[in-house]
Amino acid sequence: MEPYWNETNGHAAHPVKYESEAAVSSFPYCTESSLNFSTSATAYSEDDAEYATGRRNKTSRQDPLSHRIIEKRRRDRMNSCLADLSRLIPPQYQRKGRGRIEKTEIIEMAIRHLKHLQSECQQKESDYRSGYMDCMKEAAKFLYDVHMQDFCHRLLGRLQEHIDEMFKTDCYKSTRSCHMPDNVSASSGSPHQAYHPPLCHLRDMLATSASDVEHSQDHNDVKDLSFRNHLNQLQRSQQAAAAAAVAAAAVAVANGSSPASNAGVDSKVPLTNGGGTGGAPPAADNVPSNSTGSGSAAACAGGNSNSSGSNSSNAASSTICPPAGGSCPAKVTPLAAHQQPHQAPVITSTAPHHHHHHTDSSHHDFESSREPILHTDTSNMHSPPPRDLLLQQHPHLAHSHHTQDSLMSVRMRNYSESSHEIEHNNNYKYKNHIKERFVHELHDEETSSEHCPVAAHLQSDHSHLQALSEHSKDGTEPEIAPIMAKKRKLAEAAANGEIPLEVHTESSNAGASSANRLDKPSPSFNFSDIKDIKAELHNGNSNSSPLLAKLSAVAAAGGQLSTPSSTTAPLPPRHTFTVPIFALHGQGNYYVPLNVDYNALVPFLNGMDLLEKSYTSMPVVHPININVNFMPSSPSASLLAAAAAAAVAVGKQQQQQAVVAAGAGLPLSTNSAAAQAAAVAAAAVAKAKLEQAMNQSW
């Protein structure tokens, strides 16, 4: 009989694994050192360094308690790092109303931010290199136009060596290479003539430099004060030299020394600080750094002396050129015209855009920002030529310049919106927006409200408010506090009787009814009657109260509650609603809850309306603990309700009879009017008692 574990029967015996074969097995066993039941971060144990791998029954020097402490410290350190990262997240990225951000999301945001920083650094390096090359090209163009080819080649070679050495360092290592254009050679040869268009206008240079602003982020370096001071000194020396050259040329023309002027044009004028006209050509080694302005001015001064048939008057007129730059008269040769760039450096044309573009997007602000910021109040400095004069002298460039201005303004606005350096300006605009909204809401509250018409002395501020609202659109803060102070003073003056009555009354609805009111002496209610009202409310027998009858008569006759001055102007009508208050009882032990009409409280507020949105001088209210008695001893509410209903019915009947008599043309008797007033007074008293009983029954 064949055994069961035989290969011939198809039942091959499974291989049996032993611990000695565990080293070559592909299956993990408990004896392997790679198996670890702790967390993945603690795969290495300090016991592994002392005991051999695979040794059985090793005694661990690390007890479970210390392991838990180590794990807790590691988790605390990780949580602390995550908390630090979460505090670095800007507030605008916080999810409103969702609590804290998850830890994984914090780590993901940190990874994305680091990647963004790496790409941004590479972009800045590329932008810096391109800006450096553009500056080299502009310097080469300028030096070539003033016939300084040797100095131009040496300067370009030195600048190229400098940038090569700078980008070879560890800070600027990059795999990308930036090649110079083929038409500009830094080592040998002169720049190609086709690459250099004539510099007939400063605006061409401004357009070229401003178009590169959106690709370069290093233009803000011009805000350095030391660099700006250096440019100020350079410009002052250039303008002084130009003024001296123009004066010398004018003296030479006035003296009639035509050979000297011809020599000054045929030969190259020495570019010195004194600006003197000599006959020797300038040496490249002796050219100072501030010689460009004097050279251009001297060329402009003597540019017209070569023309045939020129007299002394024409020569004198040709020397009148702006020493600070600008275009020469039309008779100047093209070479002299090419030598008249504006004295403001090209790099400074980008700095004013950063200060002006965020206030307004109009072309006016963009044009005003083109004025150089380096001019100071000195005797030798003059303002640059205006844009209109330049466009008059070059009318064929007006349309192209307008198109360039619109494109540049759009680009600068887009650049400003994406820039992180003007975040404080955005916050400033947000504050202005809030104040602008406040002004508009105040204006709408005062003018467009149908039920709350504004008094005449308040309507006078409408134009001032509108001007402030328009002025706030320009980025300036509106001054609202003086307006509110003025309104409060007027209200206090009206409450004290210092303003006449006709100032506050409205002429639209001041017809015969107002005249009748003035003819009839209406009863008034004073502050001295409050104690009597408290006593009568406490006694509870105010059905025959003369004080409440007086109050109801005031309400029936249409009179107003007067302040002690008794000259308060009538206030405009308002919506009728009740205000819950707590009135101190006559005994002074507890408060009684009451509902008082808001119109009854207005005369006691010194002319201030608590419902206005512009009311900012709210009185300081301190919380206090009061005892409220909701169930005092009083007549039953049912009896008061019945009395009030009866009084209201009698009043309505009397009113209907009065209407019928008025329609029939019958004169109303004084008895009927008195009865009607008495009925209304009784109804008011009953209603007041009913409200008091209901409030006390709460």
From Swiss-Prot:
Q: Which PROSITE patterns does this one have?
A: BHLH, ORANGE
Question: Is the Nucleus keyword given for this protein?
Answer: yes
Outline the extent of the Orange domain: 128-159
User: Which CDD domains does the UniProt entry name for this protein?
Assistant: bHLH-O_Cwo_like
Q: Does the keyword Transcription apply?
A: yes
Tell me the SMART domains matching this sequence.
HLH, ORANGE
Q: Where is the composition biased (Low complexity)?
A: 280-318
Instruction: Give one GO molecular function term.
Output: protein dimerization activity
Task: Give the protein's recorded name.
Answer: Transcription factor cwo
State the organism of origin. Answer: Drosophila melanogaster (Fruit fly)
Q: Name one GO biological process term.
A: circadian rhythm
> According to its UniProt entry, what is the function of this protein?
Plays a role in the regulation of circadian rhythms. Transcriptional repressor which inhibits Clock-mediated transcriptional activation by binding to E boxes in the promoters of Clock target genes and repressing their transcription. E box binding activity is time-dependent with higher binding activity seen in the early morning (zeitgeber time 2) than early evening (zeitgeber time 14) and is dependent on the presence of the circadian protein per. It is likely that per binds to Clock-cycle heterodimers, reducing their affinity for E box binding and allowing cwo to bind instead.
Region feature Disordered, mapped onto this chain? 257-319, 349-369
Phenotype of the disrupted gene, per the record = Strong circadian locomotor phenotype with most mutants being arrhythmic after 4 days in constant darkness and displaying a long period in both light/dark and constant dark conditions. Delayed evening activity peak in light/dark conditions and robust 26.5 hour rhythms for at least 10 days in constant darkness. Reduced circadian oscillation of Clk target genes per, tim, vri and Pdp1. RNAi-mediated knockdown results in a lengthened circadian period.
